[in-house]
Amino acid sequence: MANVLVQTHVMAMDVDALNRVGVYASADIDNGTALVCGVQSSDAKQKHVFSVTPAAAVAKDLWLAYSPEVVTTVDGTLEFRGLDVDPRNFTNAKGKPFDMFKPVAGVDLIQVTKDFFAENYDPDTISGATYVEIQADGSFKAVVSPTSSFGGLQFKIFAKEPIIIGNGTIGGEAVDAWILECTNN
C-alpha cells in the first residue's frame, strides 16, 4: 500500500511558489516521495511542468509528491476515478503530471503513515525515535537523535496521531500516523 500524506500545516498552502507540477516517466511515484526538481518542460502544452527524479542521495532543496488521492481504476482502455475510496491504493502514474510541494524548515508540519518510512525504520519500530532523516537511497528512516550537521531533508517527530481512512462504510479505519515538523531542507 502507498503512504498517505496530509499537509497538516504547510507554507505551500499560502505561497504558490512552493507548489509545482512534476512528471516522472520511468515509474509510478507515491505521495511523500522525496524528489529532485529538474528542468521545465519545453512542450508548449506543459510549460509549467518540471521533470523530476526520486532523491537518490542525502540532499536539501527537495520536493515531496503530493496529489489529491483519487484512485484510478483501469479496465482495458478505460479509466475510472473515485471508485476506490482508500487513499492507500493511490499512486501518481508514471508519465503523468502530478502535484508536489517544497517543505519549509521550521514551519511545515506533515502527517504520514507507516509506508512513508523505509521498511522496519518507522517510529514504532525504532524505540525512542525523535527525528526522521532522508537516506542515501531516498528513503526515510526514524532515528533516535538527529545526525550532527545533517545535510539533507530532515523532520522532527512532533506527535503520533491516527488518520481515519474511509473504507466505503460508515465510520472508517484508524491508521497509525505521525506528525512531522520539517527541520532541514
Segment roles from a protein language model:
Residues M1-N185:
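Surface-exposed, low-hydrophobicity beta-strand/loop segments enriched in small/polar/acidic residues
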